[in-house]
Structure formats: C-alpha cells, structure tokens
Amino acid sequence: MKQVEWDDTLWSRWPTWRLVVEEQPGTIEEKIARDQAMGRRVAAGGPPTFRLWVNDPCLVVSRRDIVQGLRRGGDPPREVDGLPIRVRSSGGTAVPHGPGVLQFSLVVPRMDRVGMEEVYRTLCRPVEAVLGQRGWRAEFGRVAGSFCDGAHNLVVNGRKIAGTSQSWKGGLAVPGSRNRGYILAHGTLWVRVDPEQAADWLNDFYEQTIGERPIRARASTSLHLLPGGEGVDVRQVIAETANVLESAMGPQVKLERVRALTDEEISWGREGASETDPRRVAYGVDRP
C-alpha cells in the first residue's frame, strides 16, 4: 500500500476546514454552480472547503470549448447523444458526469505564496491516498488522447483515471481587500465508467464543435476495470475519501464534516445555474 505525504499540500495551512459530503438534491445546473457559490462564501471569510458530490448524466465543458466551437461558426450545442451539455467555470476541456463519476472540488481563499502545483496536490492527495489504500499507485502526468488532458491528470498503470482543472477569481482574500478572491480546483474521477461510451460522447461533442474526434477510449480507464476493482462504487469511494481526510488531519486542524452546503450557498447556486448554459456563455444573453 502506497503511503502519501501531506506536508507538501495546503491542508495544514488553515486551522479549520469544511468537508461537504453532499447529499442534498439539485438540478444538473445547480450542482455545477455550487462550486462558485462555495467560492463566494470562502472569499467572504468562510472556511476552505472540500466537496464530494455526484451529478446526473451530462457533459460538462469549459468556456474554452465554447470559444473554440464559435470560431467555426454555428451555435454551441446544448446536448449530444441525448446528454445535456453544460459549462463550468474552471478550465480544462469536456468531461462526463453521471452516477459512476465522483466529482471532488476544492475551494480556498486566494492568498499570497500559494501556487498552482500546491493547489493540485491539495485537491488530489485525498483521492491518491484512497487509491493507495486499495493498492493502486496514482501519479500526475499527461496521457495523449485522454479526456481533459493535462499535466495534472491522475494516472494509474499508464491510463488516466481522473481529470483536473483550476480557476482563480478576484484578488487576495486579505483584510481590507475590495475584491477578495478564491481558488477553485475541480476533479473528475472515473469509478464505474465505460471508457468506450464516454469517448463516443466526448468525440461526438468535439465533432460538432471543432470537427475532430480527439479522444481515445484506451487512454483512460475506470476504477472498476483495475485489478481488484470489480466491486467498487462511488459511495464507497466517497466514504473512503472522507475517512482518509479525517484520519490525516492532525490535532492542529479541525475538519467539520457536513452533508449540505449552507442555505445561502444553495440560493447562490440557483442564481448561477443559468450561467452553465452554453449559449448564454457564448453570447452573454439567453438564446433559443
């Protein structure tokens, strides 16, 4: 079993954290928008937050995906193969959501001497620890042809298992700042996903928007396809991730585990839901 280190992450930087093991219902759009709602709360002085959540089936794309499609002309698609298409605020490229996919989000105040690498390590270390407990060694790396490819993919046995992205908003979250900001990092872990089906969905989207089919099914894998992973499911991975975090935090760090965001965050998520529509993102107004 691989042992992971925590000293090179941000987990000890703040004395209090919030762990959201989300159970409250919501639309696809509201669940996506809740990441930014958490950012608003953290920027205003709320505790840094780690969120574990699952969404209904859809494809979630980045603003970059929308812009690239606009360059070819035509309206951005709102669905592909019957799956809704929605837009997130962080970077990267398209990823599938659904009952076999674990979403994990990290929101911390924007502070001095915090870098992108630290943020990615902080986001992924709990998941990396869970995989290590199950005998799978995960590491960062690019995998050509994988979904949402980047240097901070989580890779097991040469295949991508999780994609990540980041978004930095506002200025430093310090007293007196007029534009207190936050850092949002997001991960998508394939727990029970058919790589062939997922690649078809992603390629159908990209064929409509950029005229290409860049995703290779064999570049990525799912936990249930790894040796010893046959019976794994998302609920198990959520529970194990929460337990890993609670065990890893020393006495100097308080981790508050909750099952829901605040009412204010839920309200902000509803307000921000319309901002996930591809055509609203493309044109700045609602379009049919």
Swiss-Prot record:
BPL/LPL catalytic domain boundaries: 44-253
UniProt biased composition (Basic and acidic residues): 272-288
Alphabetized InterPro entries for the sequence: aa-tRNA-synth_II/BPL/LPL, BPL_LPL_catalytic, LipL, Octanoyltrans_LipM/LipL
Family of the protein in this entry: Belongs to the octanoyltransferase LipL family.
One Pfam entry name: LplA-B_cat
Protein name, entry field: Octanoyl-[GcvH]:protein N-octanoyltransferase
Species for this entry: Kyrpidia tusciae (strain DSM 2912 / NBRC 15312 / T2)
Pathway: Protein modification; protein lipoylation via endogenous pathway; protein N(6)-(lipoyl)lysine from octanoyl-[acyl-carrier-protein]
Coiled-coil spans in chain: none
Region (Disordered): 269-288
Additional note from the record: The reaction proceeds via a thioester-linked acyl-enzyme intermediate.
